[in-house]
From Swiss-Prot:
<feature type="binding site">
    <location>
        <position position="121"/>
    </location>
    <ligand>
        <name>ATP</name>
    </ligand>
</feature>
<feature type="binding site">
    <location>
        <position position="154"/>
    </location>
    <ligand>
        <name>ATP</name>
    </ligand>
</feature>
<keyword id="KW-0460">Magnesium</keyword>
<feature type="binding site">
    <location>
        <position position="153"/>
    </location>
    <ligand>
        <name>ATP</name>
    </ligand>
</feature>
<comment type="function">
    <text>Nucleotidyltransferase involved in the post-translational modification of proteins. It can catalyze the addition of adenosine monophosphate (AMP) or uridine monophosphate (UMP) to a protein, resulting in modifications known as AMPylation and UMPylation.</text>
</comment>
<protein>
    <recommendedName>
        <fullName>Protein nucleotidyltransferase YdiU</fullName>
        <ecNumber>2.7.7.-</ecNumber>
        <ecNumber>2.7.7.108</ecNumber>
    </recommendedName>
</protein>
<feature type="binding site">
    <location>
        <position position="218"/>
    </location>
    <ligand>
        <name>ATP</name>
    </ligand>
</feature>
<keyword id="KW-0808">Transferase</keyword>
<dbReference type="GO" id="GO:0000287">
    <property type="term" value="F:magnesium ion binding"/>
</dbReference>
<feature type="binding site">
    <location>
        <position position="118"/>
    </location>
    <ligand>
        <name>ATP</name>
    </ligand>
</feature>
<feature type="binding site">
    <location>
        <position position="291"/>
    </location>
    <ligand>
        <name>Mg(2+)</name>
    </ligand>
</feature>
<feature type="binding site">
    <location>
        <position position="120"/>
    </location>
    <ligand>
        <name>ATP</name>
    </ligand>
</feature>
<feature type="binding site">
    <location>
        <position position="300"/>
    </location>
    <ligand>
        <name>ATP</name>
    </ligand>
</feature>
<dbReference type="GO" id="GO:0005524">
    <property type="term" value="F:ATP binding"/>
</dbReference>
<keyword id="KW-0464">Manganese</keyword>
<keyword id="KW-0547">Nucleotide-binding</keyword>
<keyword id="KW-0479">Metal-binding</keyword>
Amino acid sequence: MSQSNLQRSMPIVTLPDLFDARFDNRFVRQLPGDPETRNVPRQVRNAGYTQVSPTPVRSPRLLAWADEVGEMLGIARPASPVSPAVEVLAGNRILPSMQPYAARYGGHQFGHWAGQLGDGRAITLGELISPNDKRYELQLKGAGKTPYSRTADGRAVLRSSVREFLCSEAMHSLGVPTTRALSLVATGEAVIRDMFYDGHPGAEPGAIVCRVSPSFLRFGNFEILAAQKEPELLRQLADFVIGEHFPELASSHRPPEVYAKWFEEVCRRTGILVAHWMRVGFVHGVMNTDNMSILGLTIDYGPYGWLEGFDLHWTPNTTDAQGRRYCYGNQPKIAQWNLTRLAGALTPLIEDDAALEHGLAVFGETFNNTWSGMLAAKLGLASLEHSDDDSLLSDLFETLQQVETDMTLFFRCLMNIPLNPISGNRATTFPAPENLESVDQMNDHGLVELFRPAFYDAHQAFSHAHLTRLAGWLRRYIARVRQEGEPEGLRYHRMSRANPKYVLRNYLAQQAIEALERGDDSVIIRLMEMLKHPYDEQPEHEDLAARRPEWARNKPGCSALSCSS
């Protein structure tokens, strides 16, 4: 893999080397750690973390670097793919100011209490102080065994690491609250995995992602303390989180009120987060409580996926294929269920049930209002307050599921329909608006033809029943837009910021994985460039906006994923 390939995505900015970064580790300093030092699987008590160092790897090599994250942290891109800085990002070297640890937490998995979980292969190096004095945890995922590894090997494979690296940055560019990713490093070692848990394990290349977040604390960090009846540590952890990450609450409220206000804010942020997921068609895939961020960020990119054919019941996770607990349409309900588990864990701090119920109500209100506003924007409307808007939406969702229709492409096509063609040149996947007939002049077939790029089965899409139904809905939509009486350019602008043209389709990530396995980094570099501007027309990347190709329909890694990573 060439040095030039690693650097061609954008110009190098002069920044300090990683070795000059400042670390100040308040979490380790302010919370009690595990007094035991044995790095063997075991139950940990009365501690928020265990100090543990990464296990060195044979031959680390930098595969990808996120320039924007490096600039945010004030860290220069490593001078070469095998530089000393890469040794740090692989866990082979620890800087003097780092204090690596694995966090202790528990969680509910698929609706059942799973007991102690913890960072079984993720090791936080420390808290970096950025040039603007913000704190960020740097965490290596796949860094080796910890006391929380149970029977696992503490490593991660290339395929899951590429997916996490890419999706972290894709979500940020989409405007979705998320953790970030700084680097992707190959370990030079093989990892044995049974990808679909079907009795066919095989060797895969290993990798390590350096994840970045103000905090990786989860609902499960609090759940384990409540479950193990450690109320004083529960209070310490809550005080730490509020003081560090919700300082406006700490300065204006005192216990016990501050805990209720904090829970309310966690509920509010989670409502906004899930509404964003729904807006862009993202399905997390494994919404266990240990995968829910206390800061309202998307965390732990495992068997996630993006809606291609619109389906409220779709899940990318093979483990969830039967129950579909974590499917697209269930995500708001599951988020509230998870928040209820967090509320239960916080009862030693918030004895007033009404305060907890209020927080949960805030989640529902926040999600509903945010999602309603986002749906209005996706349709180019100022709001969804007309009497027939509910039926307009429900009929749309039913119609989209009648024939396999790509969610992302459908809304981009809807954005481009020529309601009132405007002058000037507007980039579009269709002919310029002035060359299109007005929708008033189109018959049903001509109107539906504008959506051909979104259909996976054109024969079904243009059947009489579906054509009539979709065209009927489109004419209702057009009438509704005209009721607004707003300039066409305003509708287009709203929709262009709410409806991405580019998302990280599973097959695109899989192509990047397979290319890296061959030693080719050009695919991931191109994806990183495209994903920086998901709402923009990018003619040089037009092929990456197309619907999933037929060869990827049933290909492992493209259509179905497991928790194996």
